[in-house]
Amino acid sequence: MKAIILAAGTGTRLMPLTKDIPKPLLEIGDISLMERMMINCISSNVNEFIIVLGHKKERVIEKIEYLKKKYPIKIETVENKMYSQTNTSFSVKLATQKLDDDVMIINGDNVVDERIISDLLKIKETALVVDNHKHLNEESFKLRIEDNIIMEIGKGIDIETASGEFIGISKVFKDDLPLFNSILDELVAEDAQNYYDLAYKELSKKAKIRYFYTNGLKWTEVDDKKDWLYAHTLIGEFDDG
């Protein structure tokens, strides 16, 4: 099992915080978002990581060297040299194309209850983490699931018909990787600005996908300053136990 952490984006909605560092290196309590996610993974015996680099890659590489000395982990890097013209479908494609093992895919700005990671890893098949508890809005990356198949995925889905929100954390079973990579190739060819999340819509029609529902376990994705403030609150709660 390896964990891919997507750290290539520019984080424009958090400027000026992200002017000199990418979002995953933003710190709360002297610990970066990326390190906090790695700690969650290490707690579940995931010790191998692939970090996708892009915006301010030198800062991420510097942090990686520090983390490799601090924890018993292995870290590979993949550079998305076209990070400013592409999106997560391209970044994930770069990271997964040579893998032959189960892999988690994690947005680099995720802050989550560690039980989300540990419970996801108990599922042996390809699986997505879906928040079925949070109040949805127009910005939520929603899914509509019927008979275990993703009928729709994206922000434009009717809130009333949505099954929940995809939180940006998933796991691809190694046997599904060839098909997953093929779908990613098609997404990138269609539009390099596509999100990798869209690959699961097609994959769900041809492979068995499980859905881990958060059932109230807390998380956030740090997209803007409101999220950043909420992340501070969450981490305070997590650290207090």
Walk through the language-model features, giving the residues of each.
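N-terminal nucleotide-binding beta1-loop-alpha1 segment
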Residues: 1-19
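Conserved alpha/beta core of the MobA/IspD/sugar-nucleotide pyrophosphorylase nucleotidyltransferase superfamily
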Residues: 1, 165-241
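Conserved core of the sugar-phosphate nucleotidyltransferase
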Residues: 113-189
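Short catalytic helix/loop segments, enriched in acidic residues and glycine
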Residues: 20-35
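Short beta-strand-to-loop acidic/aromatic patch adjacent to the donor-nucleotide binding site
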Residues: 101-111
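Short beta->alpha linker loops
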Residues: 29, 55, 83, 195, ...
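Conserved beta-strand segments of alpha/beta enzyme cores
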Residues: 24, 74-76, 208-210
